[in-house]
Amino acid sequence: MKDRYILAFETSCDETSVAVLKNDDELLSNVIASQIESHKRFGGVVPEVASRHHVEVITACIEEALAEAGITEEDVTAVAVTYGPGLVGALLVGLSAAKAFAWAHGLPLIPVNHMAGHLMAAQSVEPLEFPLLALLVSGGHTELVYVSEAGDYKIVGETRDDAVGEAYDKVGRVMGLTYPAGREIDELAHQGQDIYDFPRAMIKEDNLEFSFSGLKSAFINLHHNAEQKGESLSTEDLCASFQAAVMDILMAKTKKALEKYPVKTLVVAGGVAANKGLRERLAAEITDVKVIIPPLRLCGDNAGMIAYASVSEWNKENFAGWDLNAKPSLAFDTME
């Protein structure tokens, strides 16, 4: 059987990425051009800046991904691309490049939901057994997803306000930490003690919903009041207390979901899945099911995860037309 090569594009936010996947599971290349330095001085992602950066580097990323994979344009079998959710301008750059490549070479175009990409990045660790449950935690999303089979996703719980990664970045900004603040807060948390009593919203409620706005506000108020009084608070203890509250919420809701949906596998993915504290809590407390977390290089936004997610769409022949457009608010359980 002839080998299949999928060229995948990811430009939903501030990472320009192009990857090549051979057949179902051999990731030959995964080129990522980061924009962190450009957005750092703004304390967050500036959509217009992100779009311009994507335009500047997308062609070079395509060339590098093909070269690293050891293939030519003529070897590519199909093109996969993120079409949502994300920043509309950023998404359009990847979509335009992917459609142009596919059209020029007469190849099928595979539409991929960004969050499906995060989830299916776990396929890089080992073949996934369905049904499974997934906890997706990133800067824009916090969701519990039931997956009956590859490509069939159902959101069973999500945040009512802030995403967990968003809360990390806002708290980090208050403390004057460098954007993105997640890794630094995690490191500082391991040096401090959980001494501040931050709220764990909805932790005892009988649902699978999350809320982090109250925790974020409590943190900001404590920090602000201390500044007003001229008091000094331990940054390490603040981070430890904040992270403990976050993890208590995530673990409580995940355990409740596992009780409601008896599965053998839990996938934890998204940028926050790189958090050491989360990985430690999962290892210590989730012992009845197999926990699969993508490697660190596949936790953040990258085209490799889009390539993995595209396989199930390829198998279903779920191809898009040339009118495929960016859908910045695309629902996770919606596919073209």
Curated annotation (Swiss-Prot):
It holds the Pfam family TsaD. The keyword Ribonucleoprotein does not apply. CDD domains: ASKHA_NBD_TsaD_bac. Substrate binds at residues 136-140, 169, 182, 186, 275. Its EC number is 2.3.1.234. InterPro entries: ATPase_NBD, Gcp-like_dom, KAE1/TsaD, Peptidase_M22_CS, TsaD. Its cofactor is Fe(2+). It catalyses: L-threonylcarbamoyladenylate + adenosine(37) in tRNA = N(6)-L-threonylcarbamoyladenosine(37) in tRNA + AMP + H(+). One of its GO terms (biological process) is tRNA threonylcarbamoyladenosine modification. Binds 1 Fe(2+) ion per subunit. This is tRNA N6-adenosine threonylcarbamoyltransferase. It comes from Streptococcus pneumoniae (strain JJA).
